[in-house]
C-alpha cells in the first residue's frame, strides 16, 4: 500500500477483530515499511499495559483508538493518536473535537452493532459539519467507487479504508488498493486546483 502511494498502513491489535495481527507479524511488517510511511496501531478498549506491550515490540508512529477511551488515556503513550468517533445523526463533532483536542485527528466511522469499524457501510456524509474537516479522517464503507465523491463532499484531511480494498476479510487486494489510492489522490488534486 505504501509503495502505491498510501501515507500510512494500519495493524489491528484488537483481539476481537477478524483483522487482528500478531505482534510477530506486526514487527515483520514494521521492518518492511521502515522509512516508507507511517505505521498505525489500532486498539479497542484495551488496557494501558496491553497498548504498551505492543509499543515495546512494534515501532508504531501513531495510535488509533476505536473504543470508549478518554483523552487522558489516549495521550499517555506520548505518540500522536487518532480517536475514532462512531457516526450517527446525533453526534456533535464540535464536542468531539473539544473532548479530544489533543488528538492528531478524529476518524469518523460508520456504526454497526457489535463492530468497531470495518463494517463496509457508509454513514451520511452530510453529518460532517463544515469547518471541522481539517482534523477529520473519513472512514466507513469507502471504496474506489465512492472515495472521490466522499473527498469532494467532506474534504477530509485523509481517508481510511479496510473492507473496501479486501479480497476477503483481512486479505487486501492489490488492484483494489491501487484503484482506491489513485481515486483518492485524483479527488484531492481536484480540490486543490
Where are these regions (language model features)?
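Conserved anion-binding
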Residues: 10-17, 21, 25-138, 142-146
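C-terminal active-site rim and adjoining tail of enzyme catalytic domains
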Residues: 135, 139-146, 151-164, 177-185
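Glycine-rich phosphate-binding active-site loops on the catalytic face of alpha/beta enzymes
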Residues: 6-17, 65-70, 112, 153-178
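Residue-level signal for inorganic ion chemistry
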Residues: 1, 63, 106, 161, ...
